[in-house]
Amino acid sequence: MVQENKNFATAKAKSIRVSPRKLNLVAAFIRNMKVSEALVQLTFSPKKIAKVVKDCLQSAVANAENNLGLDIDRLVITKATVGKALVMKRVMPRAKGRATRINKFFSNLYITVTEKEDN
């Protein structure tokens, strides 16, 4: 069996306390972007979740550099996947003795960076 040289690294952030819809806005924004450009965009993004996405991206870059020896200047974000995690169900009291359910969503984030050749 011939082992292929791996030129991608991954990182994940699990059980992030934000809805998948809000997290996917930021993940879709950085998808297919160069890592250096994505870090700048996430640093100055007004979204609160951008800090968590930036930390996960920096972890993926560190994995690529330390574990695989990839060049960080040529890294591109090839995948930024968002998934549903658990849902905490809470009760909110309402008028006339009723109660409604509040759902507090959690998300998972998976980022894959790949080394691209300069063209």
Swiss-Prot record:
The keyword Transferase belongs to this UniProt entry's keyword annotation: no
GO molecular function, one term: rRNA binding
Entry keyword annotation includes Phosphoprotein: no
Membrane-traversing stretches: none
Pfam family, one: Ribosomal_L22
Domain of life (superkingdom): Bacteria
GO CC aspect terms: cytosolic large ribosomal subunit
SUPFAM superfamilies recorded: Ribosomal protein L22
Keywords recorded for this protein, A-Z: Ribonucleoprotein, Ribosomal protein, RNA-binding, rRNA-binding
InterPro entries (alphabetical): Ribosomal_uL22, Ribosomal_uL22_bac/chlpt-type, Ribosomal_uL22_bac/org-type, Ribosomal_uL22_CS, Ribosomal_uL22_sf
Biological process, per Gene Ontology: translation
Subunit structure: Part of the 50S ribosomal subunit.
Family affiliation: Belongs to the universal ribosomal protein uL22 family.
Role of this protein: This protein binds specifically to 23S rRNA; its binding is stimulated by other ribosomal proteins, e.g. L4, L17, and L20. It is important during the early stages of 50S assembly. It makes multiple contacts with different domains of the 23S rRNA in the assembled 50S subunit and ribosome. The globular domain of the protein is located near the polypeptide exit tunnel on the outside of the subunit, while an extended beta-hairpin is found that lines the wall of the exit tunnel in the center of the 70S ribosome.
PANTHER family noted in UniProt: CHLOROPLAST 50S RIBOSOMAL PROTEIN L22-RELATED (PTHR13501), LARGE RIBOSOMAL SUBUNIT PROTEIN UL22M (PTHR13501:SF8)
Protein name: Large ribosomal subunit protein uL22
